[in-house]
Structures are given as structure tokens and as C-alpha cells.
Amino acid sequence: MRARVLLAPLAVLLALALPSTALAAVENPCEGAEARFLLCPNLRIAPPSEIYTQEVDGHVLLRATSDVQSRGKGPMELRGQRDGWRSMKTNQRIYKAGGGHITVPSGAKLRFTYVGTYFGGSYWKVHQLANFELRRVGPDGKVGDVVRTSPKLNYCLRDLYRTRAGRRSPENRVYPGCNQDPFRDRVALGTSVGWSDIYPAAYHQQWIDVAGLRGCFAYRMIVDPKEVLFESNENDNMSQRLVHLPYRGKPGC
């Protein structure tokens, strides 16, 4: 997350000494010398997988499974508080190495999102947690501008599958599926270290319309594209896989 208002290092250290403090807008506490006191999260996203196409009413939908992975020293955890009819503002909770946590204002918003009856109706999800895009790849292998994007913007943060075991990774789920109560004033979402939130290719809006496209493209998935979450590494939030369109069932160009 890019810095918004700079905070003197001494003030950050004083904030870290508090067990649970809501802070004013600050620079990323997971960057700089003070980060050593924190178990900062880090989100990554795996390359698109299980890719296939589906033709629907003249559209050609390129579908793929997404895997948002928690790979930092601590969990990615958001605390939402209602600020509108179907929206919540959030604070991010970051745990301290010696116990306790700090709470910092986050730029992330939660939206009560409908995903169809087959997938359970509506859930509180993080708005713009990830996006999918297609970029044309030239004969020289250079990746160009975005040509198509997915309509999907909102995602849960949850412990769905434990995808990387380790000493910092809990064996059992800590963060359940997203809340479905539209009247809740507060909710918590998160993904533990070593766990993933995975959406199958057949999920609601898990596609890009590729009708009419021909040639080689980079299918990119980006987590936290707006950089509204505090992480220890902002440079590993994108993955991609090359695909040739029309798609013939195998990645690569």
C-alpha cells in the first residue's frame, strides 16, 4: 500500500507499544525499521489455472481458477464497520511479534455482494481485492496494454485450503467463510499464513469475455490492485499465464 501521510518513526514505535490502537492514516507500517516488531501479512496470487472457455449467448467466456495466497509472517485480517446500506469501511489488524496487535485504517471497503443462488446468495466481500485482465503479447514477447477485463471485483478473505504448511501456519481454519447477514454492523475477514482463498473457474463472474480476440495474450491475475492493504511486499501481487486465442485447451502461445 502506498504511503498516504508520513508518520515519524518515533510515533510509529509509540503506536506499536499500544496493544490495540486505531491509528490515523499512516505510511505502511510493514516497511522500514519498525516492521521488525510486526508479523506483517503478504498476499500473493497463483497463476490462472484450470482454464477453459464457455460459450453463452454469443459470448466466449475464458474461465480460470484463482488462488489468493497468504504468505507473510502474519495473517491478512480486516475488521469492517458499516458506513452505508451495503458497505463497510475497514481497519486492518496487524499482529506484533511479541504478542498483541496494532490496528490501522485501511483503504479497503467491504460490499454486500450477490453471487447467485447456486453459490449461496450474498456475502460481505472485499471490494476490488483482485482483478483479472488480458494483455496482448507482441511477436517480440512484449506484453502490451489491457484489452479485456473480468467483471468480478469482490472477493472474500477466508481460510479455505491450507496450501503451504509451516510453523506460522495454523493447522485448522481461523477465518471462516464470509458473513451473509446484510444487517450486521461489524464483520471480520481474513486469511491465515499458509492458507488460500480459492475460487473455481465455474464460479460467479470468474471469467473474461474473449469473443473476437485472436493471437497471443497474457492472462494476468492481480491481488490488491489498488494497493489499499498493508503488506510486507508490494512487488509480488501479480501472476500471469500466456494463452492463445481462440483457446484450444492448453496454455501457452
What role is predicted for each listed range?
Residues 129-130, 138-213, 251-252:
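Exoplasmic/lumenal beta-rich domain surfaces
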Residues 77-130, 150:
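Short coil-to-beta strand junction motifs in C2/discoidin
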Residues 27-32, 37, 74-79, 140-148, ...:
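Beta-sandwich strand segments
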Residues 98, 231-253:
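Short beta-strand elements
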Residues 20-24:
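Sec/Tat signal peptide C-region and signal peptidase I cleavage site
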Residues 132, 213-223:
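A short tyrosine-centered beta-strand micro-motif
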Residues 8-19:
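Bacterial N-terminal signal peptides
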Residues 25-78, 252-253:
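Boundary/junction segments of secreted and surface-exposed precursor proteins
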